[in-house]
């Protein structure tokens, strides 16, 4: 379709390469640690997301209407550590597991400690609401947005 509009191949390639979708494999640097935000909230998305990493520290939050067990089945095998957090109003709480944090930012801060020790990134996922809550603070100047 873009070719039909007369766009040059180089412009199409550059656009695809530089495209960004907030909350989808979005990368930040926070206190020297790479933090990835991704709203993966179903098993196929979680499977695709997990393939992008060899290991990570996981911050996870979800809503009861989602296939949480299916999502975690793909994410947990590569998680060096896990922190569960409330994704938003009506989201799952402590029943997700422990350690559980009401405030996702506190879960992220806690995950940073482990990440600084081993150099692995932090991956926050499971809900676009969780990602949105974290992203709001990161783009407010607390973290550096990376390409």
Regions found by a protein language model. Give the residues of each.
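Short, active-site-adjacent cap segments at secondary-structure transitions
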Residues: 130-132
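Active-site-proximal loop/hinge segments that shape catalytic or ion-binding/gating pockets
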Residues: 127
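Nucleotide phosphate-binding/pyrophosphate-handling subdomain across enzymes
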Residues: 1-81
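C-terminal helical cap/extension that packs against the catalytic core
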Residues: 3, 34-35, 67-123
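Active-site catalytic pocket residues across diverse enzymes, especially alpha/beta-hydrolases
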Residues: 53, 115, 138-142
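Flexible, gly/pro- and Lys/Arg-enriched active-site loops
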Residues: 7, 16, 20-23, 74, ...
């Amino acid at each position: 379709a873009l070719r039909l509009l007369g766009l040059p191949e180089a412009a199409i390639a550059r656009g695809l390469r530089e495209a960004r979708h907030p909350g989808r494999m979005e990368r930040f640097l926070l206190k020297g640690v790479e933090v990835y935000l991704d709203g993966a909230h179903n098993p196929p998305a979680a499977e695709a997301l997990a393939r992008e990493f060899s290991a990570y520290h996981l911050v996870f939050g979800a809503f009861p209407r989602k296939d949480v067990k299916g999502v975690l089945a793909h994410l947990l095998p590569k998680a060096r550590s896990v922190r569960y957090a409330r994704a938003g109003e009506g989201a799952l709480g402590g029943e997700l597991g422990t350690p559980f944090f009401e405030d996702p930012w506190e879960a992220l801060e806690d995950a940073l400690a482990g990440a600084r020790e081993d150099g692995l990134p932090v991956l926050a996922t499971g809900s676009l609401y969780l990602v949105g809550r974290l992203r709001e603070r990161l783009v407010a100047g607390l973290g550096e947005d990376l390409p």
